[in-house]
């Protein structure tokens, strides 16, 4: 009999109901009129305390609570792989089709598709005896993974019926088992399992087989075992954020600093505060501009975010852009290849001088902006007030801002070109129904229009009354206007205050207003014109030069230039040789079209104008005329790290990028986990995003499907299950997502697969436990976390393991758990980290200092540890090299000795050290740079097989031994440092042939022998 009760209290995600007699602990219930999904977590008499996995806003006392009689369970069967679920295993793609982009409350959908037919291949026959865990059939679920249909635990007997090979849905009965009691059990292709209950196994095996990841610092120094547990700290402080002074182009507020935008929108919706981070889900999304389908168009921003970053990266580009972002903020780079325009997202910390980042060249859209300006008109002739910003008003505005001023009762425009003043007067008559008077002063002519109302009108339109030269900025209305309106303003401004250098073929505008210069670059982008901005100091004041060059840019302003139109700013990175070969090398045809292909094959940069011609030959007109009219590849000329901590900001947009910066730049809204997911020799990957911010989770959902499985070349998603639980979802769902993920992992383990589960982040789960505990009024433990925090974390990690599975045949499967922890401010002493470290056996400590020095993976070898080294050494000794452990320990000793010596060097300098100790510093540096440092983006070095890892280590340690021998025989260290083999050792990581790496040992020995002879040692 199901329990039926009534709500008596609602406190956030917790609901208390009475009349729940007969209910059970951890029973799933439907709460309120909407039937929200909840779980009973406490029973007191007939009162039940329920944690609700959906938003409880609007749920009131008196509404019903109905039990389901079952505990929170997951469906396990074909259809799990490639799926994206929320914390309670609702398929997000299916729900999106039902309710749109936002999950409506009370909506459910089956976790596995009911109508899809799977190809079932039976593996037993009638009369066979089976027990729980036996495989009765197989389904090729994806091209990588075969799904094994198992007898559920607790069922045994004789097969009395088995389906023939064919297509079946998961609801069809595929087998019948007669139990010893005579009962017939019907088996389908899926089973349900309660998430809080461990799936059973025969025997737990010691974790003595390493989980090979191909990352040298992990496999050799801090190995993870199959069935083992590891923790890795997530990125501290902020995510992919920008400096508060970064300009953002918005429809509602014009060009505005992101920190000012945050102040305006802070709390205008659902606000969340989490330590030094806070964000608001906007009640009314605002309009920004972003890159979508090859164009820069209007997009919606749904969240604003403020956080803190311990350091920033400042980038300056050739055109004058200044970009200040967090080290892990992604910018865009790209190249044109035979496959089209390939855009890559690169973290700011991974960029270097000379790289080209994608910036905005053309911003699409615009409208006839309606003006709602009211001015007071008391006496005299009333002027007409325009109600729309059109070309004529924009032109007048250009004259006024360039050469005019607002006096208390007069609008004045100064210029010695009387025809220009007459044109402005003509416009004043047409627009405002008022005429001015042209007068001649001592040095300059002026158009004076006497009207206090007109002064007020322009003041409200954004023209400053005082110190205009230094304070003016482009009016918001102009920034969102149509291109023709923008063009009218720019041409008028240039006529007054621009200088055209016919020899250079460029227009220069000089302004004392920084905001005006940057606003100009955004206006020019509305016309598809890119600007170059330079600062110049006159006296003690800074002025800004806005330069427009290039034939096509000038043409867009109606200025013809005679002569060559090449500009070295608008360069297109092109794989010329690849495209030329694909074309069949038509040299003569290209030459007739004016394309000297050999110049570009020799390395000359191809301008955009030249690429437009080339594109016609290679069938890439769409790229030339669409994508590349909208973006520019801007070269980085300076990049530096700023170590001061500061507040940082971000916005969440539908395109996951937005246009911002001092000049229009494309800004993005993690590699270690991607490397583990791609390269670890686990067959199945489960990723749990537990309480992640929406934009971070979006990154994962977008990036994982793009990753290729390196072993098969197929999408990595074909062996992956994603569980997405974002920070703005109810906190109770974080716990459900953790248990859902581990249960799915155990299910694949039972098939005999090795599973890697990544939980990101367990810290946010712990925060949810703290909130629920507080609402339950439980006695708090350290820092407000519940007293049972340690046991909850241990319970989760203990479900990892390498086991002999249930079933008649011998199968071994494993679940390896890698949990991310996100300590506030990187504080490893806080309770979640400390309790995690008591349970896990591996800790990979990410080091921001290493990341700044571009050392990846940025795992600190002095603070990381692995307790599996002794457990996995037998596997390494038997399968790879019997000296693995001895070499690993010797290398660790060297690195630790280096750390001690560096302390001495800081005090007395390196020259005070004896030769032997300086030699240790030399070899330890080689060990760091040539072994520990690994390039995730290099085709060879991204994955290093065990045999290659050991061979590289042997080469380095042999060099160390020979160095020590040479020092003892009187050879100067400077001579050792100059040995040619050192350079070859530095390149060995990029060599796929292990035999060639091994040959470096003999080469090292030979070169040292020559040194010994030279010094008579």
Swiss-Prot record:
Domain of life: Archaea
Top EC class, one word: translocase
GO cellular component, one term: plasma membrane
Record's keyword terms, sorted: ATP synthesis, ATP-binding, Autocatalytic cleavage, Cell membrane, Hydrogen ion transport, Ion transport, Membrane, Nucleotide-binding, Protein splicing, Translocase, Transport
Membrane topology designation: Peripheral membrane protein
PTM: This protein undergoes a protein self splicing that involves a post-translational excision of the VDE intervening region (intein) followed by peptide ligation.
Note: The intein interrupts the ATP-binding site.
The protein's name in its UniProt record: A-type ATP synthase subunit A
Native source organism of the sequence: Pyrococcus abyssi (strain GE5 / Orsay)
Lineage: Archaea, Methanobacteriati, Methanobacteriota, Thermococci, Thermococcales
